[in-house]
């Protein structure tokens, strides 16, 4: 699967009409066959899962599943679906307002600032009113722009929405992607560049979504980077390297050590699973998610 196109497709489509429920095996039955009722977790890591990676399930069924797995959050949910989460007592651990949001057309483009400022000015109060904290944003692609200019442009645009974010207690989080494989030409592809953006903005309400999978591909050195820059990281995503699949022994990252490093920083936010499951059956995919959570539950 082409990961970048899948993610872009999700961001464009999820805000449209909800996925119609079709004939799926009962998630209650699938979950019960793989775990005890309401899995007990250790509590040091706040676990979440990105909806788009389990989008074959209607959101209602995904909510039932995550509750049985002991989770209380799902990532990357648009406002139209927040009532469904709330009905199940689940929070949105990372919000986005679809609109014209784009991974490739972002804050490094001054010509897009008026549009982005308008969209985020509308979105920030919505997030706060729903009781949520995190709202995703993107740098955009370089398209020939050098990193210094891109940094300057991002600062100029983002600083215009930070007072509103601070007023409402909403944290704007820029996601880091690899530009080698999945998101070629994406600007925020290095943690050092993104940390400098945080420093120049100087707001506690701007942080980074540190995607462990993406940063392993682009720069490695994951644990040291987390330890030295954790104050700028407001959210984490996981996936196996290579392939962006399960985080088990089939890939190169040792997630228990990474999770322990995160816990040792005093981090209280969410870690969201964002791998693409390889299981052929729903039962296998449910078991894989349970295993991923167990691996990260240090």
Indicate residue ranges for each PLM-predicted region:
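Histidine-acidic metal/acid-base catalytic patches
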Residues: 2-67, 131-133, 188-210, 214-298
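Active-site acidic/histidine proton-transfer and metal-coordination neighborhood
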Residues: 13-26, 41, 109-207, 217
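Active-site-proximal loop/turn and secondary-structure-junction residues that shape catalytic pockets
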Residues: 53-55, 78-80, 98-100, 141-143, ...
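Catalytic domains of carbohydrate-active enzymes, especially glycoside hydrolases
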Residues: 62-81
């Amino acid at each position: 699967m082409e990961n970048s196109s899948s993610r872009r497709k999700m961001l464009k489509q999820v805000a449209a009409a909800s996925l119609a429920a079709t004939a799926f095996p009962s998630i209650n039955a699938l979950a019960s066959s793989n775990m005890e009722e309401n899995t007990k977790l250790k509590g040091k890591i706040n676990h979440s899962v990105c909806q788009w990676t389990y989008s074959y399930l209607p959101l209602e069924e995904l909510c039932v599943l995550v509750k049985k797995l002991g989770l209380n959050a799902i990532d990357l949910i648009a406002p139209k679906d927040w009532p469904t989460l709330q009905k199940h007592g689940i929070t949105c651990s990372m919000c986005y307002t679809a609109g014209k949001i784009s991974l490739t057309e972002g804050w490094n483009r001054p010509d897009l600032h008026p549009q982005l400022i308008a969209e985020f000015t509308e979105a920030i109060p919505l997030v706060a009113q729903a009781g949520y904290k995190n709202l995703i944003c993107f740098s955009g692609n370089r398209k020939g722009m050098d990193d210094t200019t891109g940094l300057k442009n991002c600062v100029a645009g983002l600083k215009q929405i930070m007072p509103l974010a601070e007023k409402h207690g909403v944290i704007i989080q820029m996601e880091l992607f690899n530009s080698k494989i999945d998101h070629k030409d994406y600007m925020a592809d290095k943690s050092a560049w993104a940390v400098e953006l945080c420093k120049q903005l100087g707001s506690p309400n701007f942080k980074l979504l540190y995607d462990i999978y993406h940063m392993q591909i682009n720069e490695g050195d994951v644990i040291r980077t987390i330890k030295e820059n954790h104050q700028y990281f407001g959210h984490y995503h996981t996936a196996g390297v290579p392939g962006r699949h399960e985080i088990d022994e089939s890939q190169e990252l040792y997630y228990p050590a990474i999770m322990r490093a995160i816990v040792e920083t005093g981090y209280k936010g969410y870690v969201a699973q964002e791998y693409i499951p390889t299981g052929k059956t729903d039962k296998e995919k449910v078991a894989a998610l349970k295993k991923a959570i167990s691996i990260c539950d240090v």
